[in-house]
Amino acid sequence: MTVDEIFSELAAHMIKGIMIHDQMSSYYDFLSLCGYQKCHEYHYWCENASYLKLKHHYFKYHNKLIKEKEIENPNLILKSWYNYTRSDVDISTKRNAVKSGLEKWMDWEKETKLLYEKMYKELINLNEINDAKLLEDLICDVAHELSQAETEYFNIKASDFDIEYILMEQCEKKEKFKAKMKGDWK
């Protein structure tokens, strides 16, 4: 792969990540789970910041625009959900949606980490150390986010996805991510 191809691949993946966190934010907002909604809103803004940093890095050190690639819409929200209102969501649906949403989040972060590691190796092989350093930072960020997602999943799984447990933690999560968004969040 060339440096241009690597950055094009990274940019497309980041844009898809922005779309995923936007959709997950809407997903949890629809389910009236404000803590998870705010978590994904926070990660949406972090992904945007990382994407802008990637573009700026490329402009600054390669003096070019990143070539755009076609990006597939992740469509994380089931089409059938668009026929319902929040009041139509029962406990069983909410419980299953939390499990599914957390699994999708973990899968995405695992995929992202693998891609970043692969691109890092490519850049090292091309002796593009400055570019690789940028990827090294992104790998650390995504490893941390994956750890958060897995911890959340395993904690809730330990409660057998108990809806009371899930609901009880929403206010605290909302305030945590709200504070992160007000502070130095990136």
Question: Predicted segment positions?
Answer:
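Iron-associated oxidoreductase/ferritin-like identity signal
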Residues: M1-K186
